[in-house]
Amino acid sequence: EMLRSLSVNNNRKIPEARLFELSHVYIPVEGQELPDEREILTLGMYGNGIDFFGLKGCVEELLDNMGIKKAEFRPETENPTFHPGRTARLFVWKNGERKDCGILGEIHPEVAKKNECPQRIYVAMLDVATLIEASSLEKQYQQLPKFPAVTRDLAIVVDDNAYVADLMAAIQEKGGQFLENVSLFAV
């Protein structure tokens, strides 16, 4: 349904769109007569300046607003609906347990063409129950620090095959309680 909505917007000469949809998806389960019903939040977007990282940023903002502190994006190459080099699977943690929360990325050009969509369509499909289960909206009071924060920009060179999630985890582990924020970018 999301691809159809994006296609309609594109065909009406709307230069960019950012849409969301909340719907039920029925997934067949081997050995069961009835399928598994899941509520899915779908985000879809296209337009100038919109790319995978823009979509990922929207998902990260959602996770932050829901109080989900630990999430991981891993490359996904097996889903034929998505472009294999521009897709990630999202995992979230609750009580130390990693849960598959969904997928996000660029729709495969062949799928976009079949649906009469512009070439670069970005979609995220997130399991609502998993998001809610991992969320924590409790606000905690934090005392102001005795000393002002120090911001450091570090430039490091890493192997092209290194995963951002692994780098973030290593930096956060070594930074410990004194590290407040890590932001990675590529040049």
Language-model segments: residues:
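Polar, glycine-rich mid-to-C-terminal structural blocks
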Residues: 1-30, 38-39
